[in-house]
């Protein structure tokens, strides 16, 4: 069933190429269509007319989704509770602080930073969009964001919880207003805190040039 925030997600798709693991691209790089195989700006849907390419894309995507789900569940004290929540169509509650910290950025800054990091071919770990709060959440390695002081962003405390849908929930879908912009692929790869800070700072500076005040 379409999410009530679908219109918002359509706008995001128009701005961003959907980010996902693929046979020809590293995690978070923009080289081939995502799981829905949509013809988004910058994609090459004609390649999918080749049955072999289509099959490889589907197999790689399915494998990454399964691996990402298992990785997230393994970060919880009771992995079965994570899968039970997903099977019930709910958000799973996974503790932060041990395996990652969460950097939260207001949506305009966060989306711009995602685009900038991909354009620079920097690795992106899992990224969530929380539409109801207008926030983008980045998973970063614990201890890599000490002294964070960038306006428009916050670093959650180590005791916070990640509320996340199953990794297959991507635009144009959402669960309780949350969707993955970059779903986990099971490798455990996270966003580098320093590179994320640079991308967010650049996004903020660019916004200031056009008069945005965040």
List the predicted regions and their residue ranges.
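Signature for HUH/AEP ssDNA processing cores
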Residues: 2-132, 142-145, 156-157, 169-214
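Charged interaction scaffolds used for protein-protein
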Residues: 151, 158-162, 202
């Amino acid at each position: 069933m379409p999410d009530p925030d679908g219109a918002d997600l359509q706008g995001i798709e128009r701005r961003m190429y959907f980010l996902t693991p693929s046979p020809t691209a590293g995690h978070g790089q923009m080289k081939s269509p995502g799981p829905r195989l949509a013809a988004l700006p910058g994609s090459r849907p004609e390649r999918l007319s080749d049955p072999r390419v289509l099959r490889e894309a589907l197999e790689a995507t399915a494998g990454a989704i399964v691996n990402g789900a298992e990785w997230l569940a393994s970060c919880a004290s009771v992995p079965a509770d994570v899968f039970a929540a997903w099977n019930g169509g709910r958000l799973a509650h996974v503790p932060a602080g041990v395996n990652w910290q969460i950097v939260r950025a207001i949506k305009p800054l966060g989306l711009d930073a995602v685009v900038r990091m991909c354009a620079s071919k920097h690795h992106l770990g899992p990224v969530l969009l929380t539409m109801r709060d207008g926030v983008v959440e980045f998973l970063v390695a614990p201890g890599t964001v000490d002294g964070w002081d960038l306006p428009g962003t916050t670093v959650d405390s180590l005791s916070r919880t990640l509320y996340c849908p199953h990794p297959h929930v991507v635009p144009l879908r959402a669960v309780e207003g949350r969707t993955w912009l970059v779903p986990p692929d099971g490798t455990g790869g996270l966003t580098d805190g320093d590179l994320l800070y640079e991308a967010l700072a650049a996004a903020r500076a660019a916004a200031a040039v056009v008069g945005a005040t965040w």
